[in-house]
Design a protein with these regions (language model features):
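HIT superfamily nucleotide-processing domains
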Residues: 1-162
């Protein structure tokens, strides 16, 4: 059973659809958009979700503001991005030992438009009815975290990505 607490979806939607890109604002160092960074290189960044529906829920994005998950990358850039996502997913698997790892790209031109991939490890033992889309929906609550627990997890994941 995954411990979850209610998530204020209305506040999240308002924040997600407000002007400005959350990833670009995070990269610019704006305090309201701070996330625990796992790893980064010249072109990519991996970080923990501030509202994780599953333990260790991480995101990976290009540093450049791209919006088309396929069309805005050239072949080399897309393959490099996918290699970075794979490294993050392997780190999630090494640290958290999930039953299954979900990879998906979400976002919309209406909000969270900066291309990013979600890397979510499904803990072992989650009943089938609570897996897949159900497990990813914050409407079912989010995993409670602290700044300290997120920082420690980011360090573990960073070590596993090396």
């Amino acid at each position: 059973m995954i411990e979850r607490v209610p998530h204020d979806l209305e506040a999240y939607v308002a924040r997600s659809t407000a002007p400005g890109c959350f990833i670009c604002r995070m990269l610019a160092g704006e305090p309201d958009f701070e996330h625990e960074i796992i790893a980064q290189d010249d072109a990519h960044i991996a970080f923990l979700s501030r509202w994780p529906p599953l333990p260790g829920y991480a995101l990976a994005a290009p540093k450049a503001h791209l919006e088309g998950v396929v069309r805005d990358f050239d072949d080399a850039g897309y393959l490099a991005m996918m290699a970075f996502v794979r490294r993050l997913a392997l780190a999630v698997e090494a640290v958290l030992g999930p039953e299954r790892t979900y990879l998906l790209s979400l976002g919309s031109r209406q909000g969270n438009s900066h291309v990013h991939w979600h890397v979510a490890g499904l803990p072992a033992g989650v009943p089938y009815r609570e897996q897949q889309f159900h497990a990813l929906m914050t409407e079912h609550g989010i995993v409670p975290t602290t700044r300290e627990s997120q920082a420690a997890l980011a360090r573990e994941l960073a070590a596993a990505m090396r």
